[in-house]
């Protein structure tokens, strides 16, 4: 019996060795990178500080490589463990240790835990479905719409203003010296960690009747693309202004359609192609008609456009991957929010730890109290905004949500121009109008086509039995 237990622990020891050896190898290579960047003679300087000290228009590329190197702290041991447990049929064994349950939950979605299952109790099963809820009156509907509109507007307008402030403005310390916060990844980490905690708390407070069935590792792909898109979004603000970024986000319809064609073999209507082209045309007019003296370099403009393009590519993959997960496993949006933000927190936390970015960001925070306030409010707005997104789509559907967010983008551009003194010519304003007209046209055509199809389905003659 003793020999059996001893042999039964061998897989756990091998799995732990994968993690330890990977971390040691990554630590070794990070030391080599520090030395190559000039940190050999100054051991007090972190890798994150060395990367930030590279004064170049292309320093963001080095930062990106270092970030991805940090993410490998999670990806590499995860991949090795996945291959190893499949090869030895580890999950079919009867030893129900904590490690066995954790790996089982990551690979198959089955575990003995309730944190993400959110709905396995008898009380949840007896709870009436949403479809049986009493129908709201017109006044109640109006109040609910105002609540959703106000929540989305306040949370995301505040988030947009603070996002631009943190990445572009100087903060004063206690001695009156000014400095900029540079670590975009720390902002991504704080946003995702708070969003994960909010989603987890909400699932515990109001469990969903839908049992969670998806393997946790499936969320890692959406998490990686999500943190990459967020990082590119923050970095882009160092090279282009916020109105440009907001308009560029409207153009993500094009990469979403392309990614849908590639991943899901999706088919699109002719009006979808027309509106996508109109949005692109409007964006070209806006870029041609907007100017910002603080970002006059051609290199920085091209860099900003490239960063925004990468943001749209990764964001498009996130949307399509999440859509495929919803179809395959039928989880609720809050379960998706919880799972994606869990892995996003793990990825960014591992990368920050490897670079020493935690200490740098915390040191900046202790010296600049206004930054702490802005960062906390930014994270709260991001988390609360996600809750309002899911609530609005659940109550009113995606069309109403799209209209609200389109109005939010228009107001965000005006706010940014007013607060941060961005100048836009008449050609730029015309480009903005084209973009928003195209978005509303797209929403109208979608609704119109859906109504026509419903009528055609209702008028279809029934076959006699």
From Swiss-Prot:
Under the heading InterPro entries, the entry gives:
SCL35B1-4/HUT1 (IPR013657)
Say what the protein does. Mediates the transport of adenosine 3'-phospho 5'-phosphosulfate (PAPS), from cytosol into Golgi. PAPS is a universal sulfuryl donor for sulfation events that take place in the Golgi. Required for the dorsoventral patterning, suggesting that it mediates the transport of the sulfate donor required for the sulfotransferase activity of pip (pipe).
The entry assigns this protein to a family as follows: Belongs to the nucleotide-sugar transporter family. SLC35B subfamily.
Give the highest taxon in the source lineage. Answer: Eukaryota
Q: Which gene encodes it?
A: sll
| Record membrane topology | Multi-pass membrane protein
* TM annotation in the entry: 13-33, 61-81, 142-162, 185-205, 270-290, 299-319, 339-359, 370-390, 391-407, 424-444
Q: Which organism is it from?
A: Drosophila melanogaster
Describe, from its UniProt entry, the tissues in which this protein is expressed: Expressed throughout embryogenesis. During oogenesis, it is expressed strongly in the nurse cells of the germline. Maternally expressed at the syncytial blastoderm stage. Zygotically expressed, from after germ-band elongation in the invaginating salivary gland placodes. Remains expressed predominantly in this tissue throughout embryogenesis, but low-level expression may also be present throughout the embryo.
Molecular function (GO) terms for this protein are: 3'-phosphoadenosine 5'-phosphosulfate transmembrane transporter activity
The subcellular location is:
Golgi apparatus membrane
Listed A to Z, the keywords are: Developmental protein, Golgi apparatus, Membrane, Transmembrane, Transmembrane helix, Transport
User: What are its GO cellular component terms?
Assistant: endoplasmic reticulum membrane; Golgi apparatus; Golgi membrane; membrane
Q: What happens when the gene is disrupted?
A: Flies display defects in wingless (wg) and hedgehog (hh) signaling, probably due to the lack of sulfation of glycosaminoglycans by sulfotransferases such as sfl.
A Pfam family this chain is assigned to: UAA
Which example biological process does GO assign this protein? 3'-phosphoadenosine 5'-phosphosulfate transport
Provide the primary localization: Golgi
Keyword Transmembrane helix carried by entry: yes
* Protein name as catalogued: Adenosine 3'-phospho 5'-phosphosulfate transporter 1
């Amino acid at each position: 019996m003793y020999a059996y237990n001893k042999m039964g622990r061998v897989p756990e020891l091998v799995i732990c060795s994968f993690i330890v050896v990977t971390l040691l190898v990554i630590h070794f290579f990070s030391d080599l990178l520090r030395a190559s960047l000039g940190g050999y003679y100054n051991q007090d300087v972190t890798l994150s500080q060395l990367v930030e000290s590279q004064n170049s228009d292309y320093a963001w590329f080095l930062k990106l490589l270092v970030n991805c190197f940090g993410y490998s702290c999670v990806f590499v041991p995860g991949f090795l463990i996945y291959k190893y447990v499949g090869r030895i049929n580890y999950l079919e064994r009867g030893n129900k240790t904590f490690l066995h349950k954790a790996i089982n939950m990551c690979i198959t979605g089955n575990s003995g835990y309730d944190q993400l299952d959110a709905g396995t109790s008898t009380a949840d099963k007896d709870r009436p479905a949403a479809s049986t809820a009493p129908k709201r009156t017109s006044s109640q509907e109006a109040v609910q719409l105002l609540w959703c509109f106000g929540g989305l507007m306040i949370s995301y307008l505040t988030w947009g203003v603070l996002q631009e402030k943190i990445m572009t403005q100087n903060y004063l310390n206690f001695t009156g010296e000014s400095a900029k916060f540079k670590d975009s990844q720390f902002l991504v980490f704080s946003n995702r960690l708070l969003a994960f905690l909010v989603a987890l708390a909400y699932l515990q407070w109001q469990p969903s009747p839908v049992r969670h069935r998806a393997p946790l590792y499936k969320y890692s792909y959406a998490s990686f693309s999500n943190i990459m898109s967020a990082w590119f979004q923050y970095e882009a603000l160092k090279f282009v202004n916020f109105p440009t970024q907001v308009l560029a986000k409207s153009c993500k319809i094009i990469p979403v359609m392309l990614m849908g064609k590639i991943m899901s073999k999706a088919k699109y209507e002719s009006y979808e192609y027309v509106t996508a082209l109109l949005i692109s045309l409007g964006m070209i007019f806006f870029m041609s008609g907007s100017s910002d003296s603080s970002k006059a370099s051609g290199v920085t403009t091209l860099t900003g456009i490239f960063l925004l393009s990468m943001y749209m590519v990764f964001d498009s993959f996130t949307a399509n991957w999440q859509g495929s997960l919803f179809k395959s496993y039928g989880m609720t949006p809050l379960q998706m929010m919880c799972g994606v933000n869990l892995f996003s927190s793990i990825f960014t936390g591992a990368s920050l730890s490897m670079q020493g970015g935690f200490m740098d960001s915390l040191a900046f925070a202790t010296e600049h109290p206004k930054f702490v306030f802005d960062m906390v409010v930014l994270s709260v707005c991001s988390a609360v905004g996600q809750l309002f997104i899911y609530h609005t789509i659940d109550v009113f559907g995606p069309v109403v949500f799209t209209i609200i967010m389109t109005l939010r983008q228009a107001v965000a551009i005006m706010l940014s121009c007013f607060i941060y003194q961005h100048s836009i010519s008449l050609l730029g304003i015309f480009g903005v109008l084209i973009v928003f007209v195209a978005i509303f046209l797209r929403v109208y055509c979608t609704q119109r086509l859906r109504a026509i199809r419903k009528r055609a389905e209702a008028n279809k003659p029934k076959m006699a039995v």
